[in-house]
Amino acid sequence: MRGQSTATPIDVATVRSWLGDGGETAFIDVREEGQHGAGHPLLVPRVVILDPEITRDTPEWLWASTGIRALDHAVERFYTPTHQPLTDVLCIEAIRLLVRELPVTMHTPGDLDARLACQLAAWFSLFGAFNARTGLSHAIGHQLGGRCGVPHGQTSCVILPHVMLFNAPAAADRLAVIGEAAGVMTEGKSTEDAAKAATKTVARAIKALGCPTRLTEVGVTEADLHPIAQATFDELRPGMNPRRVHDPDEILEILKAAL
């Protein structure tokens, strides 16, 4: 449904205390099952303030899981078919910073330099949001969030490694570069092996942060999987994901593996 507001515009400024994208981009209605987006230039903040001092009181689970959400943004925008040179550079730097600095912020919460590095990485991961599109991990996350009430950071923690593995046959070269940014020693490895190593490295990083890694940990049951798979398939559009998804059953297999 489209409409045109006639209200007097109000400038928006946001101060983000976590690492997700809500401070810059998201206006979503989740009062009903699923998600409904609202978009207008006047909704875009004129100013976004990144102050690591403000994040000191952010709950650890929220900080860590939204950090993985930012990693999900960067990974999916790097291997999307619509990737661009500018977004490639920013996404790889985001991956490098998040994998290196996010654990530091958990072990040494007072390290403001590490916190700022994570904030910058999350910002980098959002560039080109409407050109370099996200793929299957985000599509599944939308349904898990809207239908099952799972916070988006936690959907990324559970789903991203499984989607990376699914996409490996179609995006091994890009996943190998992601692996290098994440600290994988790729010398002597085939592209396919480097891609698998990238997936394992991301999965280990998520587990080391203490984030959930199974759907059952976030309240999703086997009975939820079929409708989520169908709704995810309905959301996907050509060019969103590096590997084509032919039917909902392929998504269902990913969900079962993550259960």
Predicted regions and their residues:
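Fold-independent oxyanion-binding glycine-rich loops
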Residues: V30, L50-E53, T58, A121-A122, ...
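Flexible, polar/low-complexity N-terminal or interdomain linker segments that lie immediately upstream
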Residues: M1-H40
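Structural motif
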Residues: A26, V47-V48, R69, L126, ...
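Active-site segments that bind and position negatively charged phosphate/pyrophosphate groups
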Residues: R77-T201
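A glycine/threonine-rich phosphate-anchoring loop and its flanking beta-alpha core
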Residues: D21, A38, L43-H83, A176-A181
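Internal, well-ordered alpha-helical segments in soluble enzyme and binding-protein domains
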Residues: D11, V48, W63-A70, C91-A94, ...
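C-terminal charged capping/lid subdomain of soluble metabolic enzymes
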Residues: L175, T186-L259
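Buried hydrophobic positions in well-ordered alpha/beta secondary-structure cores of metabolic enzymes
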Residues: D51, L71, C118, H138, ...
